[in-house]
Amino acid sequence: MCVYIVAGLGNPGPSYDKTRHNVGQMVLDILSGGARFRRHKTNNFYLSLGDILLVKPDAYMNLSGPVIASLMKFHSVSDLLVLHDDIDLPLGTLRFKQGGGTAGHRGLRSISDCLGSDYARLRVGIGRPENNQSIEDFVLSNFSPVQTDIISRTIQLAAEAVLHLRDNGFVGVKQFIAQTKSPSRT
């Protein structure tokens, strides 16, 4: 029986796979251990890890709310953890947050419009653009080689944090993040 839905935000298609905006889905790829996600009639790709259902919405990030909401209804699950990029956190930083605003993140806004704002988030810091690059171009670009090393370690830690849902729920995730040193910026 599914107890938690863990949704990794990102955009669909191979051209977005390695972009900053897709770090939430990158965490799910680590958790899947190479297993293939299956398509669900609610426009999601999913993979069950027992009591945790990993979900990749098959919609652009700013349209992810309706597909996540329909899957939650289908499985009668009320506990949601959303994995997403955050430009307000330095590269390599992880933060757990229960409820709250969207900070301008369109994927979170879409989810909040459908479900309200009382859901958990695991924020993955991607840093801010430099050299007057627009935020849109920045989040849709790939990481540099140095940044890739940092974000790879961060994504691994985020995947480990998600597994703490099994034993201690959201408290376990929060405690793991608080006790873990985020990969340092170089």
Swiss-Prot record:
It holds the Pfam family Pept_tRNA_hydro. The record marks 85 as: Stabilizes the basic form of H active site to accept a proton. It comes from the Bacteria. Signal peptide: none annotated. One of its GO terms (cellular component) is cytoplasm. SUPFAM superfamilies: Peptidyl-tRNA hydrolase-like. It catalyses: an N-acyl-L-alpha-aminoacyl-tRNA + H2O = an N-acyl-L-amino acid + a tRNA + H(+). It is found in: Cytoplasm. Its EC number is 3.1.1.29. The keyword RNA-binding applies. Keywords: Cytoplasm, Hydrolase, RNA-binding, tRNA-binding. Its main location: cytoplasm. CDD domains: PTH. The active site is at residue 21. The record marks 11 as: Discriminates between blocked and unblocked aminoacyl-tRNA. GO terms for molecular function: peptidyl-tRNA hydrolase activity; tRNA binding. HAMAP family: Pept_tRNA_hydro_bact. Hydrolyzes ribosome-free peptidyl-tRNAs (with 1 or more amino acids incorporated), which drop off the ribosome during protein synthesis, or as a result of ribosome stalling. Catalyzes the release of premature peptidyl moieties from peptidyl-tRNA molecules trapped in stalled 50S ribosomal subunits, and thus maintains levels of free tRNAs and 50S ribosomes. PANTHER family: PEPTIDYL-TRNA HYDROLASE. Monomer. NCBIfam families: pth (TIGR00447). Belongs to the PTH family. This is Peptidyl-tRNA hydrolase. It comes from Tropheryma whipplei (strain TW08/27). The lineage of its organism: Bacteria, Bacillati, Actinomycetota, Actinomycetes, Micrococcales. The gene is pth.
